[in-house]
Amino acid sequence: DTPLGFFATPVNYDWRLLAGPSYGQYATRIWDSYLFHTVPYYSQHKDDIEYDQFNQLGTQASLGCIRLLVCDVKWIYDNCPIGTRVVIYDNADDPGPMGKPGTIYTDPADESKRGWDPTDPDSANPWDAAFRSGTAIRSEAAWNEWNDAQNDGRWNGSINPTDLQGWSTDSSVEGTRG
């Protein structure tokens, strides 16, 4: 199971060997053996994703790591320095300030696209650019809630236990938990 609590990221990796064996791209360690990472890849090639695993995003499908779309895990990798505080909690009734992302499915029969995460920003990705923006699957309501949370002080750019009382959930994680 994914651990709940407060953590600080100790290290990140371009590619990380996972159980299987398989590989996760843009992995960031949360604690112990738990990582934020992409859906597993068969090899360290961006067009070699385990496409049958991709369609399991949003379900518990691993040993407790948190699987994310490439656009989301790359954002963490690019924007969260080592030592970033991470809060993992569990409350499916409250999707948090960004809401629960929509689900993207790949067609296992489509050999031209199935090896890619649709949100990977790599220019060789055959998917439509709308998926690569990282925002195509966020709802307008989620963005409105995010803006409201910033405006009314529920989110001020820093996370601490006081900020989270009565507000936080891990459903932002739950939707991509795996």
Per-region residue spans from a language model:
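Electropositive
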Residues: 1-8
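Exported/periplasmic cell-wall-interacting domains
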Residues: 6, 13-178
